[in-house]
């Protein structure tokens, strides 16, 4: 097992072949095309998906755009973040914890609605 940092070389339209460090969490670059710009190179980790009754609701994964020209943390950043597709944003740890807490609260509200519906359907109006 090599202890050397991983690197990858990707062809780009504006810089030719670009060699860059490949984070251990990156799962590769299957969607990269030779006519992509260097600024479009991004790393992404394994997706964590929310599936309900066989239906894909959303997913999230660690992402990083090492050459982004618009370093906007919620959209594209040199600093790794977690991209959450349902909100179309990339979050830092604090924001991700906040989203998780909000989803916990929402899950509680859904349970309350289920209880209300159960009462309604059971004739407990």
Describe the function of each predicted region.
Residues 1-125:
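Positively charged, low-complexity terminal tracts
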């Amino acid at each position: 097992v090599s202890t050397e940092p991983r690197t990858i070389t990707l062809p780009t339209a504006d810089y030719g072949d670009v060699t860059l460090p490949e984070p251990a969490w990156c799962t590769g670059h299957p969607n990269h095309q030779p006519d992509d710009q260097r600024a479009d190179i991004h790393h992404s980790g394994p997706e964590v998906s929310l599936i309900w009754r066989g239906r894909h609701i959303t997913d999230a994964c660690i992402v990083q755009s090492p050459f982004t020209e618009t370093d906007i943390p919620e959209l594209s950043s040199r600093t790794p973040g977690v991209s959450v597709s349902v909100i179309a944003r990339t979050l830092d740890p604090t924001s991700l914890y906040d989203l998780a807490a909000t989803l916990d609260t929402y899950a509680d509200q859904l349970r309350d609605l289920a209880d209300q519906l159960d009462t309604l359907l059971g004739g407990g109006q």
